[in-house]
Amino acid sequence: MAHKKGGGSTKNGRDSNPKYLGVKAAGGSTVSAGTIIVRQRGTVIKPGNNTGIGRDHTIFSLVDGVVTFRNGRNDKKRVEIVPS
């Protein structure tokens, strides 16, 4: 007879690495060109004036200015930069 219990298998015990998604520059804050404004999965927030979008849907600033969030058509949220 075994004097130790067998190590049973389990379906738990895993965790994924954090992805650090979300808004990185709040509305009204001043940003410089190239600053990441939003990191997201899919286009939850659409890019507006003076912003660009990366291949992973990250929205970033193209000019120096102030971040502005606004609601566009069809309930789509947009972020844009007002140049300073």
From Swiss-Prot:
<dbReference type="GO" id="GO:0003735">
    <property type="term" value="F:structural constituent of ribosome"/>
</dbReference>
<dbReference type="InterPro" id="IPR001684">
    <property type="entry name" value="Ribosomal_bL27"/>
</dbReference>
<dbReference type="InterPro" id="IPR018261">
    <property type="entry name" value="Ribosomal_bL27_CS"/>
</dbReference>
<dbReference type="GO" id="GO:0022625">
    <property type="term" value="C:cytosolic large ribosomal subunit"/>
</dbReference>
<keyword id="KW-0687">Ribonucleoprotein</keyword>
<feature type="region of interest" description="Disordered">
    <location>
        <begin position="1"/>
        <end position="21"/>
    </location>
</feature>
<dbReference type="GO" id="GO:0006412">
    <property type="term" value="P:translation"/>
</dbReference>
<comment type="similarity">
    <text>Belongs to the bacterial ribosomal protein bL27 family.</text>
</comment>
<dbReference type="Pfam" id="PF01016">
    <property type="entry name" value="Ribosomal_L27"/>
</dbReference>
<protein>
    <recommendedName>
        <fullName>Large ribosomal subunit protein bL27</fullName>
    </recommendedName>
</protein>
<keyword id="KW-0689">Ribosomal protein</keyword>
